[in-house]
């Protein structure tokens, strides 16, 4: 039999018979590894242990201790085990697909009756039976006629449709455990017992159209989470409990920040408290941008389709745009406009007004641009996923030689802003040229080198994502981790060689000839709406004092103190503090509870003693202890605390 050479991660190589499987390779290394192995990476591709290897290759054997590969297989097998459990309990249920998703898995079922919470408990119990049975997982490759005939005979029309959509040259792999079978690319574990029985949980049921098409049948999607051990599952469930407590929609009601309603899906109704937070944050961003040399512009929200066609967005983005048809007076045909989904084409129009010289560059142009994008109603989620939003958007027009300095400047600015807003660190992902791209290799070489060099002025710890840049330029993505461990992708920085060409942006170089500027797209917060949702949840509503909508409430203990309450509020207001009076005829404990639920950072109680001594009784949000403080000293302290970070004397400029 022909021999092949397999190279292991340590660089050693061994010869095996052609057609050897990873399971046989693992067993040849040690009996222990043969039992612990769950999958293998062969020439960079993840396969199950039954995959035959026919040619020289690199190979790495994985066990349950290999986080990424183990988690993928555990979650994948959980989806299949769940589908088997459902069909063993309800044999008439039809199965469709069940992929791995972040933190877990789901499977879509066609069942006449809705699944109930009690059903989820029964399914979990059946899954544990299947796991404890340790049924071996086996696989076969079938031809299309055999696979279609099998699923037609078993009344599984969704599987037949899936097979018919698979390219004819792609093998059809069938996986079994016990008597249950599914069509799947794999890979899978060696037996069902390799799934830890105490590390998964079924979470919820939701509706989902087959193939995401609202004209197709509505299915029932069961979601589950799965991890490598019980402790990881408990940690995740605790995080979900914390997330529920911090839900910005719940806190938004309690703090009277905003609401949303059916008549304007995906659009935010900002209340006075919420709008105060919004404008305070926007004012802060405006100052930070100004000190970094940005000019601020404002561009139209309704723009003729001609501009979107010229920019390329009409072809690529039309389904996400709100289209407006207008009967223009004396026009032969209707004017077709769109609400702008992004600001960049409009910024090029501003740039193009007047001749630009290389001496004018870099030109940093910012806008708090109101944008609208169509999102399916099922995808909308409070402030996190909306249709109408405002971006902290900016575009930098520069020469190729200026890319590195502008990138480094941006990263420093972003780092300062994130720190000011309570996020001490962030992660960077650097996405490089895709196979299909615009621009010459020389330009890409220069841009990628500039971005990487700029990153390294801040950190050497970044994630490289080869081939995942946009077709028009390399990009950086910035991720934050919040107080309960969730990651949020927020900031972006992207070089663009295409839009200046499409929209004919030029500058006069030192040689007197016209050149195309590079356009650097950048955002720090993303959208104000989403960022405020993240901020509310990160702080569980207890926003930094300078951002809190109501910074101080002064509450009377007795009605005789009402005038002093007003005097205290006036003194705080003169010092630039957002203060309110509460002189209702209610007990002080009632007032404290109500304003604590509303996340007011400081509550000042005023009674007869405070009035006579010109003091206040101070209570901080979340603290049980109170203290009596002189009014003048307190006003000075709170005024310093209310000062935005960029305006404090100890805060250096970006």
Swiss-Prot record:
Co-factor(s): Zn(2+)
User: Which residues take part in binding Zn(2+)?
Assistant: 344, 395, 521
Its protein name is Threonine--tRNA ligase
Q: Which family does it belong to?
A: Belongs to the class-II aminoacyl-tRNA synthetase family.
* PROSITE patterns, sorted: AA_TRNA_LIGASE_II (PS50862), TGS (PS51880)
Q: Name one GO cellular component term.
A: cytoplasm
Biological process terms from the Gene Ontology for this record are: threonyl-tRNA aminoacylation
Please give the Gene Ontology molecular function terms for this protein.
ATP binding; metal ion binding; threonine-tRNA ligase activity; tRNA binding
Tell me the segments the record calls region Catalytic: 247-544
InterPro entries named among the record's database cross-references:
aa-tRNA-synt_IIb (IPR002314), aa-tRNA-synth_II (IPR006195), aa-tRNA-synth_II/BPL/LPL (IPR045864), Anticodon-bd (IPR004154), Anticodon-bd_dom_sf (IPR036621), Beta-grasp_dom_sf (IPR012675), TGS (IPR004095), TGS-like (IPR012676)
Which reaction is the catalytic activity of this chain? tRNA(Thr) + L-threonine + ATP = L-threonyl-tRNA(Thr) + AMP + diphosphate + H(+)
Q: How does it assemble?
A: Homodimer.
Q: Which organism is it from?
A: Dinoroseobacter shibae (strain DSM 16493 / NCIMB 14021 / DFL 12)
User: What is the phylogenetic placement of the source species in the record?
Assistant: Bacteria, Pseudomonadati, Pseudomonadota, Alphaproteobacteria, Rhodobacterales
Which superkingdom does the taxonomy of this entry point to?
A: Bacteria
Instruction: Give start and end of each TGS domain.
Output: 1-63
What this protein is reported to do is described as: Catalyzes the attachment of threonine to tRNA(Thr) in a two-step reaction: L-threonine is first activated by ATP to form Thr-AMP and then transferred to the acceptor end of tRNA(Thr). Also edits incorrectly charged L-seryl-tRNA(Thr).
Kindly state which keywords UniProt assigns to this record, in alphabetical order.
Aminoacyl-tRNA synthetase, ATP-binding, Cytoplasm, Ligase, Metal-binding, Nucleotide-binding, Protein biosynthesis, RNA-binding, tRNA-binding, Zinc
Enzyme Commission (EC) number: 6.1.1.3
Note describing how the cofactor binds = Binds 1 zinc ion per subunit.
Q: Where in the cell is it found?
A: Cytoplasm
């Amino acid at each position: 039999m022909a021999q092949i050479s397999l190279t292991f991660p340590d660089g050693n190589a061994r010869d095996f018979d052609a057609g050897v499987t990873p399971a046989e390779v693992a067993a040849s290394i040690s009996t222990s590894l043969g039992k612990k192995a769950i999958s293998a990476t062969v020439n960079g591709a993840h396969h199950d242990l039954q995959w035959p290897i026919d040619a020289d290759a690199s190979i790495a054997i994985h066990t349950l201790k290999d986080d990424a590969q183990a988690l993928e297989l555990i979650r994948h097998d959980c989806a299949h085990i769940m589908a088997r459990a459902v069909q063993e309990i309800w044999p008439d249920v039809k199965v469709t697909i069940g992929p791995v998703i972040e933190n877990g898995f789901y499977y879509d079922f066609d069942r006449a009756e809705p699944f109930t919470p009690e059903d989820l408990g029964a399914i979990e119990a059946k899954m544990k039976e299947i796991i404890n049975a340790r049924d071996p997982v086996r696989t076969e490759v079938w031809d299309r006629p055999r696979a279609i005939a099998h699923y037609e005979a078993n009344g599984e029309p969704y599987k037949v449709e899936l097979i018919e959509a698979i390219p004819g040259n792609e093998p059809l792999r069938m996986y079994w455990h016990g008597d249950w079978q599914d069509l799947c690319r794999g890979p899978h574990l060696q037996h069902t017992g390799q799934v830890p029985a105490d590390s998964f949980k079924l979470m919820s049921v939701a509706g989902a159209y087959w193939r995401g098409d609202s004209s197709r049948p509505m299915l029932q999607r069961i979601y589950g989470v799965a991890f490598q051990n019980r402790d990881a599952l408990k940690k995740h469930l605790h995080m979900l409990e914390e997330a529920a407590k911090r839900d910005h929609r719940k806190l938004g009601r309690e703090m009277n920040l905003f609401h949303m309603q059916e008549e304007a899906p995906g659009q935010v109704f900002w209340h006075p408290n919420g709008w105060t937070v919004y404008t305070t944050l926007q004012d802060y961003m405006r100052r930070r941008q100004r000190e970094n040399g940005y000019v601020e512009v404002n561009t139209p929200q309704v723009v003729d389709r001609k501009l979107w066609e010229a920019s390329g967005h009409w072809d690529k983005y039309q389904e996400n745009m709100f289209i407006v048809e207008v009967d223009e007076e004396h026009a032969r045909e209707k004017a077709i406009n769109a609400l702008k989904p992004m600001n960049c084409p409009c910024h090029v129009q501003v740039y193009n007004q007047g001749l630009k010289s290389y001496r004018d560059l870099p030109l940093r142009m910012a806008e708090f641009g109101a944008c609208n994008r169509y999102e399916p109603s099922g995808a909308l989620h409070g402030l996190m996923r909306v249709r109408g939003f405002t971006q902290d958007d900016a575009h930098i027009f520069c020469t190729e030689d200026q890319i590195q300095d502008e990138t480094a400047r941006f990263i420093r600015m972003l780092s300062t802003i994130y720190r000011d807003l309570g996020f001490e660190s962030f992660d960077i992902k650097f996405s490089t040229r895709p196979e299909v791209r615009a621009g010459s290799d020389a330009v890409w070489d220069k841009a990628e080198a500039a971005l990487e060099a700029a990153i390294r002025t801040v950190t050497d710890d970044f994630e490289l994502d080869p081939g995942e840049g946009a077709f028009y330029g390399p990009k950086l993505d910035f991720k934050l981790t919040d107080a309960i461990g969730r990651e949020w992708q927020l900031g972006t920085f992207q070089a663009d060689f295409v839009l200046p060409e499409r929209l004919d942006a030029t500058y006069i170089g030192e040689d007197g000839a016209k050149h195309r500027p590079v356009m650097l797209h950048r955002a720090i917060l993303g959208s104000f709406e989403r960022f405020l949702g993240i901020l509310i949840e990160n702080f569980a509503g207890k926003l930094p004092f300078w951002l809190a909508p109501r910074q101080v409430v002064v509450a009377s203990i007795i009605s005789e103190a009402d005038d002093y309450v007003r005097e205290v509020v006036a003194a705080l207001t003169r010092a630039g503090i957002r203060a309110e009076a509460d002189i209702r005829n209610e007990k002080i404990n009632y007032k404290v509870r109500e304003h604590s639920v509303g996340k007011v950072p400081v509550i000042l109680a005023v009674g007869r003693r405070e009035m006579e001594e010109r003091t206040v009784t101070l209570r901080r949000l979340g603290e049980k202890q109170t203290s009596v403080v002189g009014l003048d000293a307190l006003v000075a302290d709170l005024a310093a605390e209310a000062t935005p970070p960029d305006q404090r004397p100890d805060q250096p400029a970006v």
